[in-house]
Amino acid sequence: MIILGIESSCDDTAAAVVSDHNTVLSSVVSSQVDVHHRYGGVVPELASRMHIEAISPVVAQAVDQAGISPDQIEGVAVTRGPGLIGALLVGFSFAKAFAWAKNIPWAGVNHLEGHIYSLLLSDDPPAFPFTALLASGGHTSIFHVVSQDRFELLGQTRDDAAGEAFDKVAKMLGLGYPGGAVVEALAAKGDPCLIPFPRSFLDKDGFDFSFSGLKSAVARYVQLNRENLGEMMPHIAAGFQSAVTDVLAFKLIHAARATGCSRIAIAGGVSANRFLASRMKIEAAKHNMALYLPPPSFCGDNAAMIAARGHRLISQGDLCQLDSDVFSRTRFL
């Protein structure tokens, strides 16, 4: 079955064509980063307007790169939530109209489940069950992934997501938006042990996260060290990144041991962080666990993961109807 995937939950307009569950024929992403950079973050209304401009060309490009005609598409999968309502509605409305015009089935995909499915697009996907950390700009959660359709939420952030914390620290340091890659690059020049930022493990027997305290500690340090901030910036970035990584690694390993899993995985935009990946490889080896990461091109938001998850939903008959709608908050479909 050939599935067209569409993703528009935040500031990336993406389309992909996937066949046979995990064979990616094409994947196109149109980023709005250059536009939102000047505002220091995503402007929802602006994001929606840019999705409207990009959606048709992006879908056309994905179909063309897949080497197929639109008539060969047998189903449509589209992100239904969570995300920015206006942004979601652009992709969702396009998918609904496309499927209705072609008289083909369509499915709404939970964005978080899509990120978990990005792990299945690898040449060496994890076998079930596995324990997955999903870390991005909007979400930080741990799931026990029992099967293709069973995702048990073990813990989640109580405040800021890990990626969101990176963005906010980048803003404190005057590095602009988005912050993940620039903080990582700056941290590579610093000493992660020089500034002992706090690690918030909350209840060590639980799997929830909290990064607001760490964010506040960085803000206080920046405020108190304005005079030599320039020379300290690499060390601030390194200390912050190390603190986030320590918490993510501890919680993921702890959750895997609690569920009896020997396979762990990281998905979402933060999985592209090489410092985190390197640390998790060490921790996995230390605990005799296998670590899985998505292909680099599928770490961030993309439509291939949406198409892969949608393929499964359509195969099971779990379809959307004309009165189906999007949702902004995290939930499972």
Curated annotation (Swiss-Prot):
Highest rank taxon of the organism: Bacteria
Residues binding Fe cation, per UniProt: 111, 115, 301
GO CC aspect terms: cytoplasm
Catalytic activity line of the entry: L-threonylcarbamoyladenylate + adenosine(37) in tRNA = N(6)-L-threonylcarbamoyladenosine(37) in tRNA + AMP + H(+)
GO biological process, one term: tRNA threonylcarbamoyladenosine modification
Subcellular location: Cytoplasm
GO molecular function, one term: N(6)-L-threonylcarbamoyladenine synthase activity
Gene3D superfamilies, sorted: 3.30.420.40
Free-text cofactor note: Binds 1 Fe(2+) ion per subunit.
InterPro entries assigned: ATPase_NBD, Gcp-like_dom, KAE1/TsaD, TsaD
Keywords (A to Z) from UniProt: Acyltransferase, Cytoplasm, Iron, Metal-binding, Transferase, tRNA processing
Enzyme class: transferase
Residues bound to substrate: 134-138, 167, 180, 273
Cofactor: Fe(2+)
EC number: 2.3.1.234
Similarity field: Belongs to the KAE1 / TsaD family.
Biological role stated in the UniProt entry: Required for the formation of a threonylcarbamoyl group on adenosine at position 37 (t(6)A37) in tRNAs that read codons beginning with adenine. Is involved in the transfer of the threonylcarbamoyl moiety of threonylcarbamoyl-AMP (TC-AMP) to the N6 group of A37, together with TsaE and TsaB. TsaD likely plays a direct catalytic role in this reaction.
Protein name: tRNA N6-adenosine threonylcarbamoyltransferase
